[in-house]
Each structure stands twice: as structure tokens, then as C-alpha cells.
Amino acid sequence: MSGDATRTLGKGSQPPGPVPEGLIRIYSMRFCPYSHRTRLVLKAKDIRHEVVNINLRNKPEWYYTKHPFGHIPVLETSQCQLIYESVIACEYLDDAYPGRKLFPYDPYERARQKMLLELFCKVPHLTKECLVALRCGRECTNLKAALRQEFSNLEEILEYQNTTFFGGTCISMIDYLLWPWFERLDVYGILDCVSHTPALRLWISAMKWDPTVCALLMDKSIFQGFLNLYFQNNPNAFDFGLC
């Protein structure tokens, strides 16, 4: 398996060759939360894969043959099949590969996890808007209040279930699908938005003990370096921290 810490490909780069038999390829970017979702599932299910990182400020021309809008993540199989959108990609991996199933077998429980994901849908946008506001020196009181309310809604679910994880007594797909945005709260400077949610904070602590989550934790100083360059519109941001 090629590591996640590979330099990005940008305009003028040559496209990678065919995906080797027995592997699946992920087109990714080290700091992207949506790609992070799919990488968590690849790791949790111990799926042999290779990583091709894409420079999102300087996308290769050929990459638009992988995704019509140039988004990440995209999975590519050795049969040249392409699967994109992070939740769809994660569900594909869970269905297509053996090992522990991350989505529940029970149809209702699977549906319940997908409904919970819908309740989470405002969080990615709000976290990004808070980050941009703080980085640009803008007032973000209302944004943070809105984010706190979303976290209060998630807190209520954990309290009602009386479980550590959103999927129950152990980690399942829904926990991995939510996690990337919670890992970023500290480096984004908005960790205080969960100060009022003890059950959610307990979930965050429990997630950090998971071997899959631990394996993909990003060094905070490297993440900060990426953000510093990203907000300077520096195309080298995506390779920050690599030799």
C-alpha cells in the first residue's frame, strides 16, 4: 500500500497508470475531511490500496476524467470503475470488501444511521465558515452559536441512546463519517463549540482510542502550516510537511 503522505499531482502532471490487480486507488488530499472519511474506511477494513493526492488549487487536466467537477475523493478499481462522493464511496467499500461490516446489517439500523447523517449535514459548512471568519478576522459569534446548536442536537441523540458511540456500543460507519470534522475543531480554533456537550466530548475522547482513528490523526503543527499557506492561496499548501 502506498502511503497517504505522497506529494500532490497538479497541472501538467502525467496521469497514473492502471490500478494494479488486487488494489483500489483513492484520489485524495491529506487535509480534506471528505477524503478522510474514505481513508478511515479503507484503514478500518484493512483494504489494500494506493493513494494519489491531488492539488486542489492546481488540478491536473486529466483528473476531470475521474470526476466531472474535479472533486475528491474518488475511488478507482482495477476494472477502471470510478466511485465518487464520500458517503457513496464508503458504502461501496463496506459492501464490496470482506471483514467486519461498518454499516449495520439490520435495514432499520442502517436507515437510522443515514438519517443521523442527514442531521449532521450543516456541520461541515458551519465549521468551514467559522474557520474562514476566524482566519479573516471577521465576527463569527452567530456562526459559532449555530454550530453549538447543531452539536446540541447530536448531544441529545447520544443522551437518548445512552451509548458511547453514535452507532451503539462500538464504533460503526456513522462514527467514521462524522469524525473528520471533530478532529479538526481544535486546529480550526473552535473546540469551545463542544464545551456544553459532555456526551459528545466523551465520544470524541473514545474515538481517539480507536486504532483506525489514531493511525490517521494529523499532526496539529503540520495542519496549521497547511492552513497558513492555504489562506495565502499558495498552491504548495497541499504538500506542506512532506520532504
From Swiss-Prot:
GO terms for biological process: cellular response to arsenic-containing substance; glutathione metabolic process; L-ascorbic acid metabolic process; xenobiotic metabolic process. The keyword Oxidoreductase applies. It holds the Pfam family GST_N_3. Glutathione binds at K59, I72, E85, S86. Residues 106-231 form the GST C-terminal domain. Keywords: Oxidoreductase, Transferase. Gene3D superfamilies: 1.20.1050.10, Glutaredoxin (3.40.30.10). GO terms for cellular component: cytoplasm; cytosol; extracellular exosome. It comes from the Eukaryota. InterPro entries: Glutathione-S-Trfase_C-like, Glutathione-S-Trfase_C_sf, Glutathione_S-Trfase, Glutathione_S-Trfase_N, GST_omega, GST_Omega/HSP26, Thioredoxin-like_sf. Expressed in a range of tissues, including the liver, kidney, skeletal muscle and prostate. Strongest expression in the testis. It catalyses: RX + glutathione = an S-substituted glutathione + a halide anion + H(+); L-dehydroascorbate + 2 glutathione = glutathione disulfide + L-ascorbate; methylarsonate + 2 glutathione + H(+) = methylarsonous acid + glutathione disulfide + H2O. Optimum pH is 7.5. The active site is at C32. Residues 22-101 form the GST N-terminal domain. Its EC number is 2.5.1.18, 1.8.5.1, 1.20.4.2. GO terms for molecular function: glutathione dehydrogenase (ascorbate) activity; glutathione transferase activity; identical protein binding; methylarsonate reductase activity; oxidoreductase activity. Belongs to the GST superfamily. Omega family. Exhibits glutathione-dependent thiol transferase activity. Has high dehydroascorbate reductase activity and may contribute to the recycling of ascorbic acid. Participates in the biotransformation of inorganic arsenic and reduces monomethylarsonic acid (MMA). PANTHER family: GLUTATHIONE S-TRANSFERASE OMEGA-2, PTHR43968. This is Glutathione S-transferase omega-2.
